[in-house]
From Swiss-Prot:
<keyword id="KW-0560">Oxidoreductase</keyword>
<feature type="binding site">
    <location>
        <position position="304"/>
    </location>
    <ligand>
        <name>[4Fe-4S] cluster</name>
    </ligand>
</feature>
<keyword id="KW-0004">4Fe-4S</keyword>
<dbReference type="GO" id="GO:0016114">
    <property type="term" value="P:terpenoid biosynthetic process"/>
</dbReference>
<comment type="function">
    <text>Converts 2C-methyl-D-erythritol 2,4-cyclodiphosphate (ME-2,4cPP) into 1-hydroxy-2-methyl-2-(E)-butenyl 4-diphosphate.</text>
</comment>
<feature type="binding site">
    <location>
        <position position="265"/>
    </location>
    <ligand>
        <name>[4Fe-4S] cluster</name>
    </ligand>
</feature>
<keyword id="KW-0408">Iron</keyword>
<dbReference type="InterPro" id="IPR045854">
    <property type="entry name" value="NO2/SO3_Rdtase_4Fe4S_sf"/>
</dbReference>
<comment type="pathway">
    <text>Isoprenoid biosynthesis; isopentenyl diphosphate biosynthesis via DXP pathway; isopentenyl diphosphate from 1-deoxy-D-xylulose 5-phosphate: step 5/6.</text>
</comment>
<comment type="similarity">
    <text>Belongs to the IspG family.</text>
</comment>
<dbReference type="GO" id="GO:0019288">
    <property type="term" value="P:isopentenyl diphosphate biosynthetic process, methylerythritol 4-phosphate pathway"/>
</dbReference>
<feature type="binding site">
    <location>
        <position position="262"/>
    </location>
    <ligand>
        <name>[4Fe-4S] cluster</name>
    </ligand>
</feature>
<keyword id="KW-0414">Isoprene biosynthesis</keyword>
<protein>
    <recommendedName>
        <fullName>4-hydroxy-3-methylbut-2-en-1-yl diphosphate synthase (flavodoxin)</fullName>
        <ecNumber>1.17.7.3</ecNumber>
    </recommendedName>
</protein>
<keyword id="KW-0479">Metal-binding</keyword>
<dbReference type="GO" id="GO:0046429">
    <property type="term" value="F:4-hydroxy-3-methylbut-2-en-1-yl diphosphate synthase activity (ferredoxin)"/>
</dbReference>
<dbReference type="GO" id="GO:0005506">
    <property type="term" value="F:iron ion binding"/>
</dbReference>
Length: 352
């Protein structure tokens, strides 16, 4: 499905919305006032493929530290503001964007002050609605529901527009997968601002991966979403790895290998798991979009090979390598993976 057409905004040099690629975001978990530690985490995220990073602003020390952090960051830095809008006024002089939580940022007067500061440097604002911290009037009326989240977003969109501000992106996060998806679906036809997708408080790697794959992957398949974060407790690189995989497997990012491998069964006569792990490790940095197949026997190998750029099928002590469905080599098992990797390299080179 085609993506919903959205307004395009810019965070430093990263475009969000419109026809821009869907960007991947994350958040540091160091104390932001620890400049060295925070920059180390940002570097890790950058090398993992993160496009935008967010840093918490808990106090004035955090706010002041962001000046050095932004100067040393290779990717755009978003200040995450809760409760005290004056921190947004401080950081607006040097960060690349600001996220506010309408549930705790305070009065319209406070928001106007933030908007006025952002206008000075053309900084985008993310309206970050969270089902766990909704404005009292919306929670009292609707409870912690999809309706409350959508009404909060619409109210704050209009508020910013009334202040003549339209460099906006929106998020509607919940720890509940279904509520998250329903909120984004409900708001999408009512505004053309870009959406930041995420499931908040998603948990540790296993649970967060499943929740995010369902919610974010499902929304992406419906054409919803312009930027995203996979939230994983205590992880950095893993957030980016999972987000990139969701983008690739939803068809929204044409980059890297799509590795097809069988789940194994009683017909297996080779160490397929070791072979797949080795292929994954050796090809993890490849950017060329390729379909490769690693199969344990010939039952499905021939069929999968027809749809693969490069394929390998193991047998008993031997196997075969295929390119675009055609057998190019039959070799002993000990030589198969090395030849397979060589064929992948050759396929990439053949594309120029």
């Amino acid at each position: 499905m085609q993506r919903y057409p959205t307004k395009q905004i810019k965070i430093r040099d990263v475009l969000i919305g419109g026809d821009a690629p869907i960007s991947v975001q994350s958040m540091t978990f160091s104390k932001t006032k620890d400049v060295k530690g925070t920059l180390e985490q940002i570097q890790r995220l950058y090398f993992a493929g993160c496009d935008i990073v967010r840093c918490a602003v808990f106090d004035k020390e955090d706010a002041s530290a962001l000046k050095q952090i932004v100067a040393g960051s290779p990717i755009p830095v978003v200040a995450d503001i809760h409760f005290n809008h004056t921190y947004a006024l401080i950081v607006s002089e040097f960060v690349d964007a600001i996220r506010i939580n309408p549930g705790n940022i305070g009065s319209a007067k406070n928001i106007k002050a933030v908007v006025d500061a952002c206008k000075q440097r053309n900084l985008p604002i993310r309206i970050g609605v969270n089902s766990g911290s909704l404005e009292k009037r919306f929670e009292d009326r609707y409870g912690r529901t999809v309706e409350a989240m959508v009404e909060s977003a619409l109210y704050n969109i209009k508020l910013l527009e009334d202040f003549d501000f339209t460099d906006i992106k929106i998020s509607l996060k919940s720890s509940d997968v279904e509520r998250t998806m329903q909120a984004y679906r409900a708001l999408r036809p009512k505004t053309n601002y870009p959406f930041h997708l995420g499931v908040t408080e998603a948990g540790t790697a296993f649970h967060a991966t499943i929740k995010s794959a369902i919610a974010l992957g499902g929304l992406l398949l419906e054409g919803i979403g312009d930027t995203m974060r996979v939230s994983i407790t205590g992880e950095l690189e893993e957030e980016i790895k999972v987000a990139k995989a969701i983008l690739k497997d939803s068809g929204r990012q044409k980059e890297g290998l799509n590795i097809i491998s069988c789940p194994t069964c009683g017909r297996l006569q080779a160490d397929l798991m070791a072979a797949v792990k080795l292929v994954e490790e050796k090809t993890k940095d490849i950017k060329e979009p390729l379909n490769v197949s690693v199969m344990g026997c010939v039952v499905n190998a021939i069929g999968e090979a027809k749809g693969a750029d490069v394929a390998i099928a193991f047998g008993k002590g031997n196997g075969m390598i295929m390119r675009h469905g055609e057998v190019v080599a039959r070799l002993p098992e000990s030589e198969l993976v090395d030849r397979f990797l060589q064929e992948i390299d050759d396929e990439i080179k053949s594309r120029g």
